[in-house]
Regions:
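Glycine-rich nucleotide-binding loop
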Residues: 1-8, 57
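Conserved acidic segment of CheY-like receiver
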Residues: 21-31, 36-41, 80
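Alpha4 helix (beta4-alpha4-beta5 surface) of REC/receiver domains from two-component response regulators
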Residues: 34, 38, 93, 116-133, ...
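Residue-level signal for the "D+5" position in two-component response regulator receiver
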Residues: 51, 86-89
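Acidic catalytic/metal-coordinating carboxylates
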Residues: 54-57, 75-78, 90-96
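C-terminal output helix
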Residues: 57, 137-150, 158-162
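Short amphipathic alpha-helix used as the core "switch/output" element in two-component signaling
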Residues: 67, 92-105
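Active-site residues of response regulator receiver
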Residues: 83, 113
Length: 165
């Protein structure tokens, strides 16, 4: 077996350790969304990804409004992968609403953005983001970063709620 290969036993242990639940991705770039799904598959992370394409749709989903009004109140994601530069309502407003909503206040939120602005980093943490990760431009690095994010939030991190489906 080559040095970088993963044994079937290690792969089974990795998959067994992955928490059930879905990833809520709020991303307006179809390319970045597709790349994220591809990276998760390459990392053997098979959790469902619920993709929302703008801030208004994300707020409707989280607040169970409009076409999402009949969502189960206990249906919470394992974590949220949130872009900042979104149409209609930006990622900061989505994050603020997640934190102000008692039901979603403890859901982990990973800011995943191309922003290099120090003020964005600072504001994300002021609004209680759990993590701030800059999107790598390089494909292999992007894939590795998504693998690390998924592995951490789905297998190592523990949350105080049981609402995962």
């Amino acid at each position: 077996m080559d040095k970088g290969a993963v044994s079937p036993l290690m792969l089974k242990a990795h998959n067994d350790a992955m928490r059930e639940g879905y990833i809520l991705q709020v991303e307006d770039s179809a390319d970045d969304a597709a790349l994220t799904r591809h990276a998760l598959r390459r990392a053997n992370i098979s959790n469902r990804v619920e993709l929302l394409k703008d801030g208004v749709e994300a707020l409707d989903f989280v607040c169970r409004r409009g076409k999402y009004s009949d969502r189960d109140a206990g249906d919470l994601p394992a974590f949220v992968l949130l872009d900042l530069k979104l149409p209609k309502v930006d990622g900061f407003e989505v994050l603020k609403n997640l934190r102000e909503n008692e039901r979603t206040a403890s859901v982990p939120v990973v800011i995943f953005t191309s922003s290099r602005e120090e003020k964005d980093l600072r504001k994300a943490y002021e609004l209680k983001a759990n993590s701030y990760v800059r999107k790598p431009v390089d494909f292999d690095r992007f894939t590795e970063v998504i693998r690390q994010i998924g592995s951490y939030w789905l297998s190592l991190n523990e949350t105080p709620y049981e609402g995962r489906k």
